[in-house]
Amino acid sequence: MEFEFIRNTLMGEYYVKCSMGHEIVGRWLQEEIGKDPTMIAQVEALIDKAFSLPSQEHTLTGTEISLMIQGDEVLVQENALSHDYDVEMESEFDFYDAESTASCGIEDFVALIEQWKDFLNI
């Protein structure tokens, strides 16, 4: 997973750009976690928990996007995708679903979080 951090010094805003197929990870980091040191600490605690109990699923439910870690796999997914919908409509939403969920290895995810902290000077 490739990513880039952008700082708008005039507006004091921070942005995350992730590679194709991982855009939702950038949205999650930017919108759900942002510059909040408490939220970043919660993510780090979840990662530590996942390393110590790899067979369990560890979840951080966000307002719109949630994080799930199990073993060495990280899944970021829009909360709307966890709702059931009609099977006939399933094919119509395939493209939307592809942009609304992404997975990566835990090592890549840890690197993303550490570099985000460094970028924000937290």
Swiss-Prot record:
Q: Which domain of life is it from?
A: Bacteria
- InterPro entries the record matches: UPF0231 (IPR008249)
Question: Which residues are in coiled coils?
Answer: none
User: Hey, which family's this protein in?
Assistant: Belongs to the UPF0231 family.
Q: What's the protein called, per UniProt?
A: UPF0231 protein VP2494
Annotated organism of origin: Vibrio parahaemolyticus serotype O3:K6 (strain RIMD 2210633)
